[in-house]
Regions:
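Active-site glycine-centered loops adjacent to acidic/histidine catalytic or metal-binding residues
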Residues: 28, 60-61, 98-99, 142, ...
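Residue-level signal for glycine
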Residues: 290-292
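Extended active-site neighborhood of metal-dependent phosphoesterases/phosphodiesterases
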Residues: 64-185, 200-206, 210-222, 230-277, ...
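Hydrophobic h-region of N-terminal signal peptides that target proteins for export
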Residues: 9-18
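Positively charged n-region of N-terminal signal peptides that target proteins for export
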Residues: 1-4
Length: 300
């Protein structure tokens, strides 16, 4: 078994060793270490020993169920600090809010940046450029829950959503993309634009109506999200964008089908590796055994 894992790690190392920027992508993981969260976290750490990851992109629902109450909530330890304790995961984490964080104190999620050195969250939505020797990728982090009507219509379960201005975020996104000059542009959010899911259709139609036209107009390379708890790669006809659903890093939803434009699906849990050179951007989907299930590639 150890030899098998070592072989897998060598394959991952070979897959990212030539990249100038390499990032881990994880989401939907906060389950106190259960439902494979802890083993997957340990696998991420072992892979980080072999590959020079610059940061972790945490795409929401770091805390499932009711979010957190404060920066001192014990869930910070049981969902995050104790679970992702590997020395090689003590790198910057760039998070966004998921719908489950909105059931609790969202300001505490931002304020945790004052508690944890690795928790880098300057705002509810923001932009970050990662640079290699001869390439650059801009990652734009969205706060998608306020962009979806159903959360505004449920103030009892999502009490602070109505305080957020969707129009301001969308105007910011348009301006940010218009000014972007990096080699690669990746937009990340918690909710999908396209996906097969039993969740509310309204979530996707609102994202298609409000976010997708901006992304298409500026011809971004990838949109990466979580929320659905399985892996999906979708390339709808007429869109220049690769739409990626990253699986849960704990409890996944095994049943997943296809929609128009589906390239790949898997119900396994796991995480992804986003990497790039000047000529290639790719995302490797990794399962809980460390196997590469599918690779999304874009070339210049």
């Amino acid at each position: 078994m150890k030899r098998f894992i070592f072989s897998i790690l060598l394959l991952i190392w070979a897959a990212v060793s030539s990249a100038q920027v390499s990032l881990l992508v994880t989401n939907d993981m906060g389950r106190n270490g259960y439902y494979e969260q802890k083993p997957i976290a340990e696998l991420m750490g072992r892979m980080a020993e072999e590959a020079d990851f610059e940061a972790v992109l945490a795409l929401g629902d770091v805390h499932h169920f009711m979010g957190v109450e404060s920066v001192d909530d014990p869930l910070w330890m049981t969902n995050y600090e104790i679970i992702y304790s590997h020395p090689e995961l003590q790198i910057p984490w760039y998070p966004i809010l998921g719908n489950h964080e909105y059931r609790g104190n969202t300001q505490a999620v931002l304020d945790y940046a004052q508690v944890s050195r690795r928790w880098q969250m300057p705002a509810r939505y923001y932009s970050k450029v990662f640079e290699g020797d001869s390439t650059s990728v801009r990652v734009i982090f969205l706060d998608t829950t306020p962009l979806i009507d159903k959360y505004h219509n449920d103030p009892q379960d999502y009490p602070t959503v109505r305080q957020q201005r969707a129009d301001r975020q969308l105007a910011w996104l348009d301006k940010e993309l218009a000014a972007a000059r990096e080699d690669w542009i990746v937009v990340v959010g918690h909710h999908p634009i396209y996906a097969d899911t039993p969740k509310s259709t309204e979530e996707r139609t609102d994202m298609q109506k409000r976010v997708d036209p901006i992304l298409r107009r500026h011809r971004v390379d990838m949109y990466v999200c979580g929320h659905i708890h399985n892996f999906q790669h979708i390339k709808p006809q007429g869109s220049p964008i690769d739409y990626v659903v990253n699986s849960a890093a704990s409890l996944s939803r095994q049943k997943v089908g296809k929609v128009e434009g589906t390239v790949f699906v898997s119900g396994e849990p796991g995480f992804s590796i986003l990497s790039c050179t000047r000529k290639e951007l790719k995302l490797d989907m990794i399962n809980a055994r460390g196997e590469i299930l599918h690779t999304v590639k874009r070339n210049k």
